[in-house]
Amino acid sequence: MKKESLIKNYIKEIVNAPFNLTAIKNEEEAFHLLALDSLLPLEKMNLIGNFLDVGTGGGVPGVFIGIMFKKLKGTLIDASRKKINYVKNVCIKLGIDNLEFVHGRIEEQIDFIEKFDNVFSKAVAELRIILELTVPYAKVGGRILLYKGKEYLKELNDAKNAIDVLNVDLEDVVEYEILDRKRVLLIFEKKDKVNGFPRRYNRILKNPL
C-alpha cells in the first residue's frame, strides 16, 4: 500500500474509533492537523536510527513518522492502555510493522534512558515539562523534536532553566503553517548525559525546572 493511502486509511480508523481517540472527527481536517502537521516540518530532514514518541495518544506523530520513514524503528508510548492498544491493532491491520507499542508512564521507563536517536512529542505539555519527559531518553548527540504553536517564544523563555539543567541546545526552529495556523518544530540536541531525570510526574508538575 502506498504511503499516502496508508496515512488516509489510518486517519479513517482513528477518526472513527469507538471512543474519543481524537477530538477531530473530520477526515480531511485530521489529514491536515494530524498527518501534515506531523510530517511537513520533517520533509527536508535526514532521520536515521530509531525514535520514541512520548504521549502518542492516537498515534500522533509516531504512526505518521513510521509510515513515511520506513527504515526508522519507532517506539510509541502512552499512559492510556485503551488508546495504545487501539493504535497497535490498527497498525497491525494496516501492515505497519516498524513500530512497537508500550503502555505506561514515560517517567517509569528506566530501560529507555539514552536509547533513542530521536525523541518526539506533540501536544503533551508545556515546553519545560515535556523537555524533562523526553531529554533523558535521547542518546548523547541525539535529537529531541517537539511540536509547538504560536506561543513557542514564551515557552522557550520559561524553559531556559530546563534547557540548561538538561544539557540540551536549541539546534533549529522549523516554522510552517497548517490551515493558516502558525506552527513550529523545536529541535534540540542533547550535549551530555543528564542524571536524576525525569523525576516523578507529580514533582515535575509541582516544581517544574
From Swiss-Prot:
Looking at the record's lineage, which domain of life comes first? Bacteria
What residues does S-adenosyl-L-methionine bind to?
Answer: G55, D78, A79, S80, I106, E107, K122
InterPro entries this protein is in? rRNA_ssu_MeTfrase_G, SAM-dependent_MTases_sf
Gene Ontology MF terms in the entry: rRNA (guanine-N7-)-methyltransferase activity
User: Which Enzyme Commission numbers does its entry carry?
Assistant: 2.1.1.-
Its annotated compartments are: Cytoplasm
Q: Name one GO cellular component term.
A: cytosol
Keyword set, alphabetical order: Cytoplasm, Methyltransferase, rRNA processing, S-adenosyl-L-methionine, Transferase
According to its UniProt record, where is this protein mainly located? cytoplasm
The cysteines covalently paired via disulfide bonds are: none
Q: What does this protein do?
A: Specifically methylates the N7 position of a guanine in 16S rRNA.
What protein family is recorded?
A: Belongs to the methyltransferase superfamily. RNA methyltransferase RsmG family.
Please give the name of this protein: Ribosomal RNA small subunit methyltransferase G
The taxonomic lineage of its organism, from the top, reads: Bacteria, Thermotogati, Thermotogota, Thermotogae, Thermotogales
